[in-house]
Amino acid sequence: MAAKDVVFGDSARAKMVEGVNILANAVKVTLGPKGRNVVLERSFGGPTVTKDGVSVAKEIELKDKLQNMGAQMVKEVASKTSDNAGDGTTTATVLAQSIVREGMKYVASGMNPMDLKRGIDKAVTAAIEELRKISKPCTTNKEIAQVGAISANSDSSIGDRIAEAMDKVGKEGVITVEDGKSLQDELDVVEGMQFDRGYLSPYFINNPDKQVAVLDNPFVLLHDKKVSNIRDLLPVLEQVAKAGRPLLIIAEDVEGEALATLVVNNIRGILKTVAVKAPGFGDRRKAMLEDIAILTGGQVIAEETGLTLEKATLAELGQAKRIEVGKENTTIIDGAGEAANIEARVKQVRTQIEEATSDYDREKLQERVAKLAGGVAVIKVGAATEVEMKEKKARVEDALHATRAAVEEGIVAGGGVALIRARTAIAGLKGANADQDAGIKIVLRAMEEPLRQIVTNGGEEASVVVAAVAAGQGNYGYNAATGEYVDLVDAGVVDPTKVTRTALQNAASVAGLLLTTDAAVCELPKEDAPMAGGMPGGMGGMGMDM
């Protein structure tokens, strides 16, 4: 095991604080509507230009081990805030830097770091309670668009696109962001349930222009095994033919004579059918088949449930208003399932989301909820160059997270004003001793910092603006984009409550850990061994006269 360097007390803390400041100073220039850009070097291709705090934080790695420890701890604040709320990373970094900077002064003067931390925690709890009180629900399209626009660095077109997408697919619907092919942003909406499996034979196509198979008012047969023998299918095919309606077969696979017979019947116009493979694999496939069954009001024909293909009846088949099957996707529109059953299924999947341990599982379960509850919207981001496309796409994703957070916990006045208003809950707060009181003061001072930074980035005098905003009430604040004092909620300058709350909580948590650090252990820099000496030059005696 390599030897380690152990550094104690102020020496350790001072170096770590240097790291905190390096990272925070690079991140905080991006805050607010007049935030500056940061250019990130790429090992290949052109550099990336961004105003996204977490993207800047992720790039920073410092040479000095102790400085790097401090920087990594604040990086954790940014990424945790991004994971939980999707936005507010720069605000969280600014808050963490302020709490660390103020706290270090008190620690250096001999105060007890543990009591300081208790005071900080007490103040943060009171501030969060106050934020919840002043929060208002975010319900209208206009409010959703405002949140999206602010999060996307005051780009109202992005806010409008997100509000439109949420309106189309509902609050629970899946909204994904992709690269567009034009200069304008576009919105594609897929209503109903879509899964990534297409027709098993191109002979099923009945709309040559769109290269899709369209089934109107079809039955849906769901089976969890392979179908290769047509005799298994005949009884149910005869019943469907009598009913005079088309049929969609979703099974693990349809092959051999079963597929050939379906194709021949389709070409001759005897029975309109389409066969597709079931989506997913393993247990996920079973779950998705069950989802489709509930959505269409049918049953999965599986041996586990005591049902067989030969004995299947029309009562066990699902139904839908319309189904479109393309080469790679199948879309079920307006399934005949009962709303109460669909709701119960959504609730069940949501419980699984809460219990999921991996991000991948959580993402897949959320997709299932969306497919059951609403639909899928795709925002295609348009830009002139690839560099602009990457930057804009990152902003759209941020804005999307922020709007979801706003719908979840409501909104507060933006521009750092909500934190100024939440200070009223702390102003009269008292700790158990003088050191805890100092901890409360640290948070009071830190909660001004986001507003100060927004104003500084806008090129104005921060102290004047902070004093003017603090003297006001409610949503009265400073709009840095226009340089005016207005009612920020009316002006559309709003932040999701969840973002502000998460930023404050995470900043206080990591800053508290830094303040209570008394030793740091890191690897000693490796000393490269000197290179081995070369061979002696020349070969004596060669070419000499004897």
UniProtKB/Swiss-Prot annotation:
NCBIfam families: GroEL, PRK00013.1, PRK12849.1, PRK12850.1, PRK12851.1. This is Chaperonin GroEL. PROSITE patterns: CHAPERONINS_CPN60. CDD domains: GroEL (cd03344). It comes from the Bacteria. Keywords: ATP-binding, Chaperone, Cytoplasm, Isomerase, Nucleotide-binding. Belongs to the chaperonin (HSP60) family. GO terms for molecular function: ATP binding; ATP-dependent protein folding chaperone; isomerase activity; unfolded protein binding. Gene3D superfamilies: GroEL (3.50.7.10), GroEL-like equatorial domain (1.10.560.10), TCP-1-like chaperonin intermediate domain (3.30.260.10). Coiled coil: none annotated. Together with its co-chaperonin GroES, plays an essential role in assisting protein folding. The GroEL-GroES system forms a nano-cage that allows encapsulation of the non-native substrate proteins and provides a physical environment optimized to promote and accelerate protein folding. Pfam families: Cpn60_TCP1. It is an enzyme of class 5 (isomerase). One of its GO terms (cellular component) is cytoplasm. Its EC number is 5.6.1.7. The gene is groEL. Forms a cylinder of 14 subunits composed of two heptameric rings stacked back-to-back. Interacts with the co-chaperonin GroES. It is found in: Cytoplasm.
